[in-house]
């Protein structure tokens, strides 16, 4: 029922969007407005004159059979379009996930171990700034510095790792701050639990206390957080 409701909502939003598919197909370059006769002919060709319930039913039956339809822009099968872009999306999402996860867990762990220190306070203030910076603004600044001024990284294209560094870092930037805070809080919670205090009394060194006792338990909710983040990146990200 939930998936059916989401599909119905997505279909209705597509229908209610301004312009409509017929006008979009006929006027992709935006240079002229098609006549009403042209629009009517295109609506007939695309099946847009059929009742809304019938159009939704035909679309849903096609989706259930693996037919996602054709793109209004390219005319190609949508499944083929997704298959063409999915590998690049996966590469970008995985790299952003690694940046956010490794950076957030590393700095969050240090902040928890040295709670109340200058480094802890500095990182907490830094994460406030990171969470308040818009992604598109950060992307523009990084492009100006690393692409326009230093000429180190490209601004577009795909291929080697250097093409993914800037967009992946921008996608991971705010999430890294969230993971850092989450990791710090989770570790501090584990530091106060009885099993950790008993292990500490037994004289186990700090590194083993962190890596063998606190970290395995504290990292579980962080992994769940990163899983949700990964799903959102795969669902579509705009910088």
Predicted regions located by residue number:
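Short amphipathic alpha-helical coupling elements at transmembrane boundaries
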Residues: 41-44, 58, 62, 80-84, ...
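Juxtamembrane/transmembrane-helix interface segments of polytopic membrane transporters
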Residues: 2, 6, 10, 14, ...
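Generic alpha-helical secondary structure signal
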Residues: 37, 51, 55-59, 63, ...
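Membrane-water interface segments at the C-terminal ends of transmembrane alpha-helices
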Residues: 9-18, 46-47, 61, 125-154, ...
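Transmembrane-helix boundary motif in ABC transporter permease subunits
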Residues: 11, 16, 72, 96-128, ...
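An internal, D/E-rich "acidic patch" concept
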Residues: 48-105
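Hydrophobic alpha-helical transmembrane segments of membrane transport/permease proteins
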Residues: 5-54, 151-166
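Alpha-helical transmembrane segments of integral membrane proteins
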Residues: 82-119, 135, 148, 158-239
């Amino acid at each position: 029922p939930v998936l059916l409701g989401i599909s119905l909502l997505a279909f209705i939003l597509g229908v209610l969007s301004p312009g409509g598919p017929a006008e979009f197909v006929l006027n992709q370059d935006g240079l002229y407005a098609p006549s009403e006769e042209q629009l009517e002919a295109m609506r007939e060709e695309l099946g847009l004159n059929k009742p809304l319930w019938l159009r939704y039913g035909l679309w849903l039956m096609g989706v259930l059979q693996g037919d996602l339809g054709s793109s209004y822009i390219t005319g190609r099968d949508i499944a083929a379009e997704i298959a063409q872009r999915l590998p690049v999306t996966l590469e970008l999402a995985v790299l952003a996930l690694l940046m956010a996860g490794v950076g957030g867990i590393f700095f969050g762990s240090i902040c928890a171990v040295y709670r109340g220190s200058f480094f802890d306070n500095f990182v907490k203030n830094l994460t406030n700034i990171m969470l308040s910076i818009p992604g598109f603004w950060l992307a523009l600044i990084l492009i100006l510095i690393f692409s326009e001024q230093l000429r180190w990284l490209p601004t577009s294209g795909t291929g080697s790792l250097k093409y993914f560094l800037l967009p992946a870092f921008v996608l991971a930037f705010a999430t890294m701050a969230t993971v850092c805070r989450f990791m710090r809080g989770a570790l501090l919670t584990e530091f106060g639990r009885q099993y950790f205090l008993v292990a500490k009394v037994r004289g186990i060194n700090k590194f083993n206390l962190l890596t063998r006792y606190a970290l395995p338990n504290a990292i579980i909710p962080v992994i769940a957080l990163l899983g949700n983040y990964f799903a959102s990146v795969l669902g579509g990200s705009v910088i």
